[in-house]
Amino acid sequence: MKRSAPVQFAKKDVANCRWLGEFLVHLESTRNVSAKTVTAYTTDLIQFFEFLTDESGHQEMSAVDPELVEVADVRRFMGDLLDSGIKPRSIARKLASVKSFYRFLLDTGKIERSPLSLVLTPRLERKIPDFLSEEEASRLFDQLVLSDQESVGPEQGQKAAVQRFELARDRAVLELLYGCGLRLSEVTGLENADVDLVHGFLKVTGKGRKQRIVPFGEPAAEALRNYFEVRRNFFRILKEGAGETSKVFVTAKGRQIYPMLVQRMTKRYLSPVTESARKNPHMLRHTFATHMLNGGADLKSVSEMLGHSNLTTTELYTHVTFNRLRDAYTKAHPRA
């Protein structure tokens, strides 16, 4: 019986899998990973040991000893996932979870060898990310500025006030997604104390709760100043809401904005300026990286601003730079 679909897990599943509970505590306390990441690791590992339980004919996961797992077991698991139509990228992620678990067992002296040492991660095709051209980015923010200015009219009442507030907020959110290359979780989690308008930088808390400093330009600074003023006036009139959270970006009810709101917002504003199928917040992060490298920024600096742990991830964006150089060569060289 195949177990390729992700399983729903409970505390008893974790308890039944030897050493899994200790590994999850290690992730949370030592590596500072998010709850979402811990859930992903747990799901992947329980799926792995559920598969081994079925393969071995046992009734309970507790009967499967991680120390006795062989290379062939891991390869059969990967083959089962592939046969079930799981994409190579998802298989690679699941394999990475299993590798992390066994690395923990080795590091803590629970086992002397890992069956993962001879298992290679599937080779993945690195897709070029969607991004806006510089002209499309200009149209996006020209549209936002115009909408923001038009919202300051004679209309009165709560509906008009909410519209002015949301336009100012949306413009500031999109300026930071593009101007600083922030991740969705980073912009929704941004604290008031993280914004330094005087010196023009943000203190960003990224993956693994790692913090970094990211500069921003005058357009983003102007959008933030405008938003802070509109937000202050809006909640002063309402006399409620804004004091409930320390977050920069809030809803009209004063609560922290949530990912789906930003995703809908991004799609709405990107739709008039690009035909790309992926109109999401990450597209603006891709655009930030692409435009920075095209403008001559060095790879290491862009990598630091994006919060990448290694340069390899950032190198994905250099394709545009190479294309630009190829175009220049083709147009200029007599033997191109």
Curated annotation (Swiss-Prot):
Site-specific tyrosine recombinase, which acts by catalyzing the cutting and rejoining of the recombining DNA molecules. The XerC-XerD complex is essential to convert dimers of the bacterial chromosome into monomers to permit their segregation at cell division. It also contributes to the segregational stability of plasmids. CDD domains: INT_XerDC_C. It is found in: Cytoplasm. GO terms for molecular function: DNA binding; tyrosine-based site-specific recombinase activity. One of its GO terms (cellular component) is cytoplasm. Its main location: cytoplasm. GO terms for biological process: cell division; chromosome segregation; DNA transposition. Transmembrane segments: none annotated. The active site is at R183, K207, H282, R285, H308, Y317 (o-(3'-phospho-dna)-tyrosine intermediate). Forms a cyclic heterotetrameric complex composed of two molecules of XerC and two molecules of XerD. Keywords: Cell cycle, Cell division, Chromosome partition, Cytoplasm, DNA integration, DNA recombination, DNA-binding. Residues 14-106 form the Core-binding (CB) domain. The gene is xerC. This is Tyrosine recombinase XerC. Residues 127-330 form the Tyr recombinase domain. It comes from Chlorobaculum tepidum (strain ATCC 49652 / DSM 12025 / NBRC 103806 / TLS) (Chlorobium tepidum).
